[in-house]
């Protein structure tokens, strides 16, 4: 029998003066059995740092290869912001960058650089990369 997801609960106060975002988030984040704790923490931090109306974790979890791990949609369902975690492949980034705004939050910056080195990625210069030092995570 396969192990199920572990649910982690976080209460995080978000205060961003520049964007006028002041929220207390009560998050219940599911950790897939194959997901490492550092990746879960980066995913949770990415959600908080990118927080805005319409943000949501992927409903399909790690198995949803066609969806962003975190995405921001407008009220009509239009994708506004695709948020990747870790070190996604260049092919995935190429596809995601055509969808709208793309950000990557990573604790695996060296691996991310290896994945994209010499590859063609649509609007590569517009991709926002937010690296976390491994010692921080």
Question: Can you say where each PLM-predicted feature lies in the sequence?
Answer:
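Domain-level recognition of nuclease-like catalytic cores that cleave nucleotide substrates
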Residues: 114-137
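Acidic-basic catalytic patches of nuclease active cores, encompassing PD-(D/E)XK
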Residues: 16-61
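Short active-site oxyanion
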Residues: 77-82, 100-103, 126
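Conserved catalytic cores of phosphodiester-cleaving nucleases, focusing on short active-site segments
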Residues: 70-72, 77-93
